[in-house]
């Protein structure tokens, strides 16, 4: 196991970072904080890809001139307008990126399926055969466990597709780690868990994902397998929108027991770097099998935010806001928003509400030295590790996002409406619908005499046209505006 040792002060209250970690954190901070500003500088040249790298360095220089690195004696009196313009351009550029369409040039395509269900092998075979028949320039990669699979039967598959066996190749986890930017497109067959697995094997660059839904409940799988031919034909021949789903970069550190320095007589301790993970949903720190509450310290940019006493803490991405965080009372967040959701698990206080933090913030969750028990951390529900007193996890926004092909511009709201019945409520009905036919006729006659506008059938009163509702809202809005203007005038004259 690869470890980086950090020499720190042994005080239980303050264990500061060593030089080795500070170098790493400076690199991460520069990537996360400068990246957005750098992209904003090239907005005017957005349609000229050759100028992108030049614009990055231009914006980076502006950030440095606005920071403490400003050269002594340089005139900085007019730098603030550039700062404001850059921030404005960032917002405009982000909007353009969300609405932009990408033309994918696919040569190497990887397919990942849920190997726990044998039926997915036959479904994958259908997809591979269709691609080989219709797109002769694409090489398909399937998992290496299907080399000798009788269900997949690569020899018969190539024979039926009338193509060479060289067009069907195999991938392994080791191959993906060495060639993470090799693939142009990824197809997943399964549920959300299959997408999470695909994200976990790509530690850096992830190819655009086409997630086909085969599970019972899915927030990430918005494409129906029944329409895979039409879907893939559109993606491989036309321009598509891509949603860059944020991931979290998690670094795990372990505090060793203090030692006595023979030269100075002072107590020192070492911090070992244990592992690094990139999660798409969440990182969870909980009390595990311990019978006592967990006691965690939550730091934001090296400042203590709060101490958490409860069953644990969830740090989630917007994609993970519909998973464990939602079950613990966290808010729903659109995946197009770059943010970090912090949700407590059964906190032993009434005032600890979930909070949403900017993605530029560096979080650190540390097991308090006075904690009665240990805690456990897991990353997207896997790789569970015990955290002892003084151990901590550093969490930042990962520079490597997970791109997924959008099925529609409103796919997020469609998924939460379909899977969670979000804001699904039966509309109010008029009381007249329970009247007998005889009394309904009397009701209509009585309403007509009083000059009320009625509908021939009271049951239809809840089905007023949308145009009429829009006119009514417009009238109410204009009336409210007039009242506000009149009150403003009165207040002005009163002054």
From Swiss-Prot:
It holds the Pfam family NAD_kinase. ATP-NADH kinase with a low phosphorylation activity of both NADH and NAD(+) to produce NADP and NADPH by using ATP. UTR1 is responsible for essentially all of the NAD/NADH kinase activity resident in the cytoplasm, whereas POS5 is responsible for all mitochondrial NAD/NADH kinase activity and consequent mitochondrial genome maintenance. YEF1 can substitute for UTR1 when overexpressed. Gene3D superfamilies: Probable inorganic polyphosphate/atp-NAD kinase, domain 1 (3.40.50.10330), Probable inorganic polyphosphate/atp-NAD kinase, domain 2 (2.60.200.30). GO terms for molecular function: ATP binding; NAD+ kinase activity; NADH kinase activity. Optimum temperature is 45 degrees Celsius. Belongs to the NAD kinase family. Residues 448-467 have a biased composition (Polar residues). It comes from Saccharomyces cerevisiae (strain ATCC 204508 / S288c). GO terms for biological process: NAD metabolic process; NADP biosynthetic process. The lineage of its organism: Eukaryota, Fungi, Dikarya, Ascomycota, Saccharomycotina. Optimum pH is 8.5. Residues 442-480 are annotated as: Disordered. This is ATP-NADH kinase YEF1. Homooctamer. InterPro entries: ATP-NAD_kinase_N, ATP-NAD_kinase_PpnK-typ_C, NAD/diacylglycerol_kinase_sf, NADK. It is an enzyme of class 2 (transferase).
């Amino acid at each position: 196991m690869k470890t980086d040792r950090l020499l720190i002060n042994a005080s239980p209250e303050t264990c500061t970072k060593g030089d080795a970690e500070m170098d790493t954190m400076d690199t991460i901070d520069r990537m996360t904080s400068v990246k957005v500003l750098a992209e904003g500088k090239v907005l005017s040249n957005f349609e000229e890809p050759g100028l992108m790298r030049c614009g990055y360095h231009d914006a980076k220089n502006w950030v440095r001139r606005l920071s403490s690195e400003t050269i002594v004696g340089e005139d900085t009196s007019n730098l603030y307008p550039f700062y404001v313009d850059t921030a404005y351009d960032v917002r405009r550029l982000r909007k353009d990126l969300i609405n932009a369409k990408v033309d994918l040039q696919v040569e190497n395509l990887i397919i990942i399926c849920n190997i726990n269900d044998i039926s997915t092998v036959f479904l994958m075979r259908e997809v591979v055969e269709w691609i080989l028949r219709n797109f002769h320039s694409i090489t398909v990669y399937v998992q290496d466990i299907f080399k000798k699979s009788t269900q997949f039967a690569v020899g018969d598959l190539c024979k039926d597709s009338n193509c060479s066996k060289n067009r069907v190749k195999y991938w392994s986890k080791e191959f993906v780690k060495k060639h993470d930017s090799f693939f142009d497109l990824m197809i997943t067959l399964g549920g959300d868990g299959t997408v999470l697995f695909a994200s976990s094997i790509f530690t850096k660059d992830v190819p655009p994902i086409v997630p086909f839904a085969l599970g019972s409940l899915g927030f990430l799988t918005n494409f129906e397998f029944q329409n895979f031919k039409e879907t893939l034909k559109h993606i491989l021949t036309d321009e598509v929108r891509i949603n860059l789903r944020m991931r979290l970069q998690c670094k795990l550190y372990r505090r060793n027991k203090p030692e006595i320095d023979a030269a100075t007589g002072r107590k020192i301790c070492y911090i070992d770097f244990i592992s690094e993970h990139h999660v798409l949903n969440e990182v969870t720190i909980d009390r595990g099998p311990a019978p006592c509450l967990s006691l965690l310290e939550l730091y934001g940019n090296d400042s203590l935010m709060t101490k958490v006493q409860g069953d644990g803490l969830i740090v989630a991405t917007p994609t993970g806001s519909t998973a464990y965080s939602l079950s613990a009372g966290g808010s729903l967040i659109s995946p197009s928003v770059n943010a970090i959701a912090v949700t407590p698990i059964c906190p032993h206080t009434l005032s600890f509400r979930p909070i949403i933090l900017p993605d530029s913030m560096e979080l650190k969750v540390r097991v308090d030295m006075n904690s009665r028990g240990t805690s456990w951390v897991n990353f997207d529900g896997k790789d569970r590790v015990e955290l002892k007193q003084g151990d901590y996890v550093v969490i930042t926004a990962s520079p490597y996002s997970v791109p997924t092909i959008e099925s529609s511009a409103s796919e997020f709201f469609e998924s939460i409406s379909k899977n969670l019945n979000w804001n699904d409520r039966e509309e109010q009905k008029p009381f007249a619908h329970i009247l007998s036919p005889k009394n309904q006729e009397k009701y209509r006659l009585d309403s007509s005499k009083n000059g009320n506008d009625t509908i021939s059938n009271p049951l239809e009163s809840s089905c007023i046209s949308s145009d009429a509702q829009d006119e009514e809202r417009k009238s109410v809005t204009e009336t409210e505006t007039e009242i506000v203007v009149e009150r403003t005038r009165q207040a002005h004259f009163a002054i």
